[in-house]
């Protein structure tokens, strides 16, 4: 028995001393939303900011509790990598509303959705990220890097109301994609050869053409390399997004805040 334990310890030590695969990484996990809050308004161009509604409260949207989240990188040089990430939140609702609100039709004309109107709604919120990371300090113990890239938000909101004022008017749906540049900072610290904790943060504030946007995203996590090519991880993540669009036919305002826990499996080659 002692010989078997000694052999197992020797094998583990030898494996720990082997270089960790680090050229390609893929993370797949579940993002459990502890908090999701948002506000949206779509009004005629000259009205101003208008009154925002909460899709969850006003429209009865049932936001998913856990969503799929994918992240990863391709390290084409020891200090240079391409990064990517995606997750999406989808929801539908059907509610007889108890507070009237304003919207617009496809021509930009104001519409009132009165109390007791039955509203069928849908929300699709997708986040895509692609970027470049420069690890200006990269050792077996610590990786510290900065990067830049694109944060691409796709927002689609569909509404259909049984009663409108003026009557029988279609509602202007929201379907927009906003690619905005981000700046990122990454810190990875190996407590042991197999265990690390990490911090990733991204941010931007930008105005261009008809768009104004701001975004921040922070993830703090830890990861255990259970096998040479497979790791198990957990983390806490939060982000906030604000976008404004001034179109010829409408003004769109949208902001949301998301926070939650991430559990995942990662593979490395």
Language-model segments: residues:
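Transmembrane beta-strand segments that form the barrel wall of outer-membrane beta-barrel proteins
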Residues: 196-209
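Repeated loop/turn-to-beta-strand initiation elements of outer-membrane beta-barrel proteins
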Residues: 79-82, 140-142, 193-197, 229-232
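Short glycine/proline- and aromatic-enriched beta-strand/turn motifs that initiate or cap beta-hairpins
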Residues: 16-89, 262, 266-268
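Extracellular/periplasm-exposed beta-strand and loop segments of Gram-negative cell-envelope proteins
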Residues: 36-66, 88-126, 152-178, 206-209, ...
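Transmembrane beta-barrel architecture of outer-membrane proteins
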Residues: 23, 65-69, 125-129, 143, ...
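Residues on the lipid-exposed face of transmembrane beta-strands in outer-membrane beta-barrel proteins
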Residues: 28-30, 70-74, 130-134, 148-150, ...
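Cleavable N-terminal export/targeting peptides
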Residues: 1-23
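Structural signature of Gram-negative outer-membrane beta-barrels, strongest in the C-terminal barrel
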Residues: 198, 218-219
